[in-house]
Amino acid sequence: MSDDGLGDAASLTATVLEEEAARQEAQAEAKRDVIFADDLLPGVGSEEMELKEGLRKGGFYTFAVLTALASFDELEGAAINVLGPDIAETFGVSDGTITFISVASVAFFVLGAGPLGWLADRMKRAPIVGTASLLFAVFSVLTGAAVNAFMLFWMRFGAGISKANTITVHSTLLADTYPIGVRGRMYATNTGLARTAGALSPILVGAIAWWAGGLEGWRWSYFVLSIPVAVLAFFAFKIPEPERGQWEKSDVLGQSLDPDNEQIPISVEAAFARIWRIDTIRYMTIALAAMGFALFPAQAIQSFFLEEEFGLDALERGFALAPTGLGLLLFLPFIGKRFDQTFRTAPD
């Protein structure tokens, strides 16, 4: 083959490789997620808004129902920790068995967040909240009616999965219903009221068990506390479905879009890329991973310690454990207000 032929072949090969490299670069560019600067994010630089005004814009109904549901969920959630010694004696099982079931209940709560979040992205959310809350009430009743530790385990499994709607479904409903400028204070108020119920729950569940009397008085705590959750579940079905991302669209475009339009799919990678840039999220995730395994068993063991060392009954254990949940409540109002102020200027 002549030198000219070899040169033409080499030139053709180089051209093909260059075209292929350009094609791959174009494909990569098309798939590359764009992360906008902070000052272009929805809500940044907006005017300050009073919490009451923000709640009025979205309607008080959604906030009231979801906050009440979260509060009663917290009330029931403390029962197994406070009443653990009585439950163990009823079923004739060890402290370790009830501690395991208590810790597993927390794991079930986290486990249910994924499936319910998947549903919340694809369906109307009010029916999910109503159905999950109703199931939570049913499993709470069945927990009180448990005949052995094996049944108790599976009833807590069902209760934990259904309660998980408060993690993923509640938060998205609130975010889409109320303006960006009040979300910090709104979530602080929502969480504060729920945590207040959680702080008082040891006293309440202990009082119900003490009032019912007897070795199996603990069952009545589950029976009684399931009633308001069941009632609120029916109110949850009436929660109006807000347009997804309506306040973000309004802030960026000046108006929300037609809710009947097909939703643009969200890139999970882009969402995580944006969220993981927030220092608070990174630090909190690492801290929870480090502390979680130590904190969860501690809540279940406290009641056994108080009963064995000091002979406290259910009501007395409730009074002893209640103060441990009050510290957070002192700071939530300030944290919520500070968040709203900071987000408008430095969201990262």
Residue ranges and their predicted role:
Residues 43-56, 243-285, 309:
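Juxtamembrane intracellular "pre-TM" segments in multi-pass secondary transporters
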Residues 61-95, 298-303:
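Extracytoplasmic
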Residues 80-81, 278-332:
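Extracytoplasmic gate region of multi-pass secondary transporters
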Residues 103-117, 322-335:
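Central cavity-lining transmembrane alpha-helices of secondary-active solute carriers
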Residues 111-150:
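Conserved MFS/SLC helix-loop-helix module at the cytosolic interface between two early adjacent transmembrane helices
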Residues 155-194:
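Cytoplasmic helix-loop-helix junction between adjacent transmembrane helices
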Residues 190, 194-244:
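Helix-loop-helix hairpin linking two adjacent transmembrane segments in secondary transporters
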